[in-house]
Amino acid sequence: MQNITDSWFVQGMIKATSDAWLKGWDERNGGNLTLRLDEADIAPFAANFHEKPRYIALSQPMPLLANTPFIVTGSGKFFRNVQLDPAANLGVVKIDSDGAGYHILWGLTHDAVPTSELPAHFLSHCERIKATHGKDRVIMHCHATNLIALTYVLENNTALITRKLWEGSTECLVVFPDGVGILPWMVPGTDEIGQATAQEMQKHSLVLWPFHGVFGSGPTLDETFGLIDTAEKSAEVLVKIYSMGGMKQTITREELVALGKRFGVTPLASAVALY
């Protein structure tokens, strides 16, 4: 009998959460991660499912996600412990046929529940499904140190944050040409911050929560982790630049345009036109 803990998706979640912990992005129970699956992914492991799956209603219906399975991190769970006990810290859930709630098919033992940021995740999944024609499958939230730091010293608007991150490392414009969305500070774990994040996810694969963290979206766990990692590396460079007295020179507008042409991407116009 196949064991679900050996599946590609459980093993992938173990690696992503462990890597994020080692990066210092997910202290204590900080951060959350969800991966949209297909029925074919989970079907071979039905023997591992709970005999009586618990049902939890969503705070608002999400018919676009009807009958869709996900693997999710649990509420109050530490990323550093996922590798030690996947079944206690992860869960496979499946949205019901009308999108009104979900059953916990596997994991989240001892009456654990999915991440408190599930509204933000599911709403963002809906928007990224539409924006990428179903290509994006992952939503990752973490407390990337240097990205958080920048929200204290830079004006919190999309064009400026995006432009500075592009300048912090040449690869950034190629990796996230759609720029970085940013919210005002909001109380986490609410439908309101979930809706605001999803609205930004219509246009951007990265969304900053000032003084808190970042949301990233991508087609795979590796791509999503790499997206955040790239932005965080640029933020680290910027933090060092500002601590050394600021930029003396940087990548110019003309060079950014040339970079976009070379790699066949269309940079966010407002960031290009900023100065």
Swiss-Prot record:
Binds 1 zinc ion per subunit. Transmembrane segments: none annotated. Its cofactor is Zn(2+). It is an enzyme of class 4 (lyase). GO terms for biological process: pentose catabolic process; rhamnose catabolic process. Zn(2+) binds at H141, H143, H212. It is found in: Cytoplasm. Pathway: Carbohydrate degradation; L-rhamnose degradation; glycerone phosphate from L-rhamnose: step 3/3. It catalyses: L-rhamnulose 1-phosphate = (S)-lactaldehyde + dihydroxyacetone phosphate. Its EC number is 4.1.2.19. InterPro entries: Aldolase_class_II_sugar_metab, Aldolase_II/adducin_N, Aldolase_II/adducin_N_sf, Rhamnulose-1-P_Aldolase. CDD domains: Aldolase_II (cd00398). Keywords: Cytoplasm, Lyase, Metal-binding, Rhamnose metabolism, Zinc. One of its GO terms (cellular component) is cytosol. Coiled coil: none annotated. Pfam families: Aldolase_II. The keyword Thylakoid does not apply. GO terms for molecular function: aldehyde-lyase activity; metal ion binding; rhamnulose-1-phosphate aldolase activity. Belongs to the aldolase class II family. RhaD subfamily. Homotetramer. Catalyzes the reversible cleavage of L-rhamnulose-1-phosphate to dihydroxyacetone phosphate (DHAP) and L-lactaldehyde. This is Rhamnulose-1-phosphate aldolase. It comes from Salmonella typhimurium (strain LT2 / SGSC1412 / ATCC 700720). The gene is rhaD.
